[in-house]
Curated annotation (Swiss-Prot):
Residues annotated for substrate binding in this entry: 139-146, 282-286
Biotech use: Compactin (also known as mevastatin or ML-236B) and the intermediary metabolites Ml-236C and ML-236A are inhibitors of HMG-CoA reductase involved in cholesterogenesis. Their hypocholesterolemic activity might be useful for lowering cholesterol levels in the blood and reduce artherosclerosis and coronary heart disease.
CDD domains in UniProt: enoyl_reductase_like
Assembly notes: Monomer.
Lineage of source species: Eukaryota, Fungi, Dikarya, Ascomycota, Pezizomycotina
Membrane-spanning parts: none
Pathway in which the depicted protein is active: Polyketide biosynthesis
EC class of the enzyme, as a word: transferase
SUPFAM superfamilies: GroES-like, NAD(P)-binding Rossmann-fold domains
Name this protein carries in UniProt: Compactin nonaketide synthase, enoyl reductase component
Reactions the enzyme catalyzes: holo-[compactin nonaketide synthase] + 9 malonyl-CoA + 11 NADPH + 20 H(+) = dihydro-ML-236C-[compactin nonaketide synthase] + 9 CO2 + 11 NADP(+) + 9 CoA + 6 H2O
Keywords: NADP, Nucleotide-binding, Oxidoreductase, Transferase
Amino acid sequence: MGVAMTEGSFIPPVKQTILTVNDKDEVVIWDDAPTPKLPADQVYVRIHAVAVNPSDTKMRGDFATPFACLGTDYAGTVVAVGSEITHVKVGDRVFGAQNEMCPRTPEQGAFSQYTITRGRIWAKIPDSMTWEAAASLPAGISTTGLAMKLLGMPLPYSETKPSKKTYVLIYGGSTATATIAMQFMRLSGYTPIATCSHKNFDLAKKNGAEEVFDYRDADCAQKIRDYTRNNLAYALDCIINVESTSTCYKAIGRAGGRYVALNPFPEHAATRKMVTSDWTLGPTIFGEGSTWPAPYGCEASEEVRLFGTELWQVASRLVEEDKLYHHPLRVIDGGLEQVKQGMETVRNGELSGEKIVVRFSV
């Protein structure tokens, strides 16, 4: 495990400041956290911006590893490179995802001063992209890719395309994941349609939805069936409650189809045998499995690890070619205290049509 660094360059500190959950199940700032060691096949990153995801707010109780680092999405500057890395150099800008609260690697997380990249779930930031935009993308990219895999959809740039116009319903079209999913699916040859509140119709259409439906409308599912001529075969649920599952199932056409949720869904609302269903867990993109409690726990998977590598190669090309844009951002200047406040904002349901990104003072 060698490390290659330029002469007189960065030497990792012994300790750093992170955001964590203590042994009393409280989210706290810890100033005496260990820093990660750099493997030969990764790079060391000084973090400039992080994004807050709903999943970050759920890392409590049985999901928490006391004093492990919180945070998934980050963007920062490479300050050291492993000896096996040849395509990245010190000073390059990168963005990526972390497997937060992982008991195997408690020192790795996004809500910190420094981190090391994980697997191949990271990429270089093009010159045209800001820190904040880059930091907002990783979780959405990873979750979208896993959902498309379960739906049986090819990734962008694949030679395989639908042979005819094929609709896919995105329930929760104004969420940050939906923003990424609609772009990926359109680039793969599908035609997204979406549900959201009326105030966010323009946002969903900007992100690629051909048509948008108000989820509060009692006739929402029937209107979707009418619009798709009873041929809808794919639904991605970004909200996951009884209403969302029921609407997706009712909207899918007479021939049936596939429903994928971003969390375990209420199975009693999944009422049609002609519809196959599944749900995805974003952190599995690393192929490392999960030690979270049932039903979230799973074994490591080489297949998923390889898929994650392929997905992030696609994502890297998309951002380099300026074909992937970010969700509307609420940018906050500061540090980990502002990240903690952002988590409370998300946890309290005070965010709609935006994603919180904290820009660190470095």
